[in-house]
A protein has these predicted regions:
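A conserved signal-transducing helical linker
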Residues: 20-23, 27, 156-170, 228
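Parallel, heptad-repeat alpha-helical coiled-coil signal-transduction segments
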Residues: 191-227
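Amphipathic alpha-helical segments and their boundaries
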Residues: 7-35
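Heptad-repeat alpha-helical coiled-coil/4-helix-bundle sensor or tether segments in soluble regions
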Residues: 65-123
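Secondary-structure edge/capping motif, primarily at the C-terminal ends of alpha-helices
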Residues: 40-54, 75, 79-82, 110-125, ...
Length: 228
């Protein structure tokens, strides 16, 4: 039964800030969270099929359970480019009031016990399967909530990136204006220098043209950033 499932120690990590994560990584985190939701229900389905004697159901259930476990460990503990729990909202969901990490790990442990019992055809298998079915419903609600949290973090990340781009473009525009003023001043100085300053004046004119093009590009980029 669920009360006899092994309690696993919660895991925490020192997370990076949201803005240091790429959009691709956050998108992959959303996919992993969605995979947990799908695989949890698939495990239950194939456990039921296995209890009815369907060929290959046990193997499929165990393979799916492995996918669920791997996805959860990656999301909570981190792996490769994946940061683990990277913000306070997720930390609260996993280890705070919701106790998402505990619920998911208990489900995984109970599913393992259920599949072993079904495979060995023990007398306790029906009761374990019944309990697995019972805990799968509240677990689905938890997994849905966690996936929504990752989607919300994705929106916040996009907003932060947009703000950063706007700030950068504004700074470039300021520098471009300063360069254009300097180029115009150089043209004036060159004109006063007479014939000797003609070449310098030509270069200054080119610089003015380039900074003008920069202004136009920055304007287009900034307009595009504000439009999204």
């Amino acid at each position: 039964m669920i009360e006899h499932a092994e309690k696993l120690t919660q895991t925490s990590a020192t997370p990076p800030t949201l803005t240091t994560l790429s959009g691709d990584v956050i998108g992959a985190l959303i996919n992993l969270s969605g995979r947990r939701r799908f695989t949890s229900q698939r495990v239950v389905l194939y456990a039921v099929l296995a209890s009815m004697g369907h060929d290959g159901a046990i193997a499929t259930a165990r393979e799916t359970l492995g996918m669920l476990r791997d996805a959860h460990v990656t999301l909570v503990e981190g792996k490769g480019v994946f940061p683990g729990v990277f913000c306070e909202q997720l930390r609260e969901a996993y280890f705070g009031t919701l106790q998402g990490d505990k619920a998911i790990r208990i489900f995984i442990r109970h599913a393992e016990s259920t599949l072993d019992a079904i495979s060995d055809n023990t007398h306790g298998a029906p009761g374990l399967l019944e309990e697995l079915l019972r805990i799968s419903t509240p677990l689905l609600s938890i997994l849905n909530g966690l996936t929504l949290m990752y989607e919300e973090q994705s929106k916040r990340h996009a907003q932060a990136q947009r703000k950063e781009l706007q700030t950068m473009m504004a700074e470039i525009k300021v520098v471009s204006k300063q360069a254009r003023v300097a180029a115009l001043s150089a043209q004036i100085v060159a004109a006063r220098a007479g014939l000797e300053g003609k070449q310098f004046a030509a270069e200054a004119s080119n610089m003015t043209s380039i900074t003008g093009q920069m202004d136009e590009l920055v304007h287009k980029a900034l307009h595009g950033a504000l439009a999204h």
